[in-house]
């Protein structure tokens, strides 16, 4: 009996030790597997987002090209360029802006009737001044008031400067008055081939984030560095776009992460 006890106790101890060792090994493997799955998911979502941005950028640039050489657009630009386009309150720029709104209204309305929202088409005066944001009734906000002016974009819109300088279309993501948007830009030229300005089409990040939110329990949010708020006037409502950690602004999503 004593011999059996002496044999069984060491075997039991060894078995217990092996069991505990196996438990920790298996637990570690599960943790590593979980970490790997999370990493794979993040990388897959990042790749999916990059592909969606590239696709939306290309579509935006193609749409901008469609509205870059219309005769009525050239007429509106010639009206604006006859005055002082560096004056944000220029009467000739305002007249040209109203010409753009009137001549392109049927196209804007037709798009909205089919798609459910107005296309975000933005014409610029050279080198980088807003001419007409065709999805808005007025151009931009100063404080709490909407104003109809040719606001200056030179300090935060390098893509507009680039297109007006080099005359070549481009696309990508850039901060504007509404925050981060996917953009496609094209030069505006007259029938004689002379460059008059530029035009861009904006695509909301909402379309990209909706695709990323398709998985169960998965939520994608978009944040912007708070330093860009001085330009992104459309994100200055702290109830809709709260500041996080004093450094970031919620652009798309909700406070609850939904």
Labelled PLM ranges:
Residues 105, 109-202, 210-212:
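Extracytoplasmic/periplasmic ligand-binding sensor regions of membrane-associated signaling proteins
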Residues 52, 56, 96-100, 151, ...:
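Extracytoplasmic/periplasmic, Sec-exported soluble proteins
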Residues 76-79, 133-136, 233-234:
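Short, solvent-exposed loop/turn and secondary-structure capping segments
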Residues 84-96, 139-149:
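Short, flexible/disordered intra-domain loops and linkers
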Residues 3-94, 113-118, 168-172, 184, ...:
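Juxtamembrane extracytoplasmic/periplasmic/luminal helical "stalk" adjacent to the first N-terminal
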Residues 39, 43, 50, 61, ...:
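Short amphipathic alpha-helical segments
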Residues 96-113, 160-162, 250-258:
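A short, hydrophobic secondary-structure junction motif
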Residues 83, 206-258:
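Intrinsic low-complexity, intrinsically disordered coil/linker regions enriched in small/polar
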